[in-house]
Amino acid sequence: MLKIERDQLAAQLASLNHLLQSLPANDYLGRLGFEARRDALQQQLGALAGAEERRAHIALYFGGDPVVGSVGVQAAFGTNVIGTFQDLLSKVWGALDGATLPQMGPIKDKEASQLHITTIVHGSFGFLLEELEDQTEPMFQTPLSQAADQVANYIASFAGENDASFSQIIDILNPRVFQAIRDFFGYIHKGKATFRLVEGERDQEFDHLAVERAWNRAEASNVAEERIHVVGRLLGVIPMKRRFELESDETGTVIEGRVGEKFGSTYLERISTQQFAGKRWRALLHKRTVTKVGREPTDNYTLLELEELPQ
């Protein structure tokens, strides 16, 4: 993992420079040896400076009650946390680029999202998880690496002090991804553990306060999705903004939201110009309900299908 390698080399270089400064002026042989080692480290660092990490590499270090120094971690804790982290990564990977993640059941091609434990890392105790499926060097960042970036961002947003960042993230989370994040922090919180996450150029530590904050947010929040049919009057469609308004026959309330990708721009123009508005339709809507800490649930709607009814 490039960041860990660079950090380790930088630490060795700093230690070596300190030794060189402390050497007696007449210790010529010692100085030659240390300078040769220093030059080699600088060369290694220079080679890594321009390197780009395109595959998924994640290091998870643990502290707190389940960990015995840098010697070991409780087996049940380690198994559960690594398992839920992999589950979270697989679900984020399954929803990349707007792909549909089913509400339940297996994730398509899930095996392609699996990481491998390649190394036990020390400095507390942890694991290095790496993408190993394709041994040829990719030209671009792999989808699994993109998913790892998102996972790290979600974890940081749940545990961070910025409420606005958390609020923005939960507004877009798939319910299964949300549940996986809740499970991950649930095991960390229950185990009275702390952790450090290294992914890409991100290196972030999560103390007991951060874990408690993330767990409280996950417990007090919820994300639910369902498809519903609504019969009512189409009040209007704004093609440029892809927005709609529909008055429900049953409740009399006006439902507004986003028009789904199924509806092309030409079709939306027809709806807005050919007196489709005011007519009765049977609409299939995607309803998303988000519950946040200390707030009333909010509903968001996406129009999926329209079926014209006899007027």
Language model segments and positions:
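Beta-strand elements of well-folded, non-transmembrane domains
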Residues: 66, 236-238, 287-289
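Long, positively charged binding patches that form subdomain-scale interaction surfaces
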Residues: 155-270
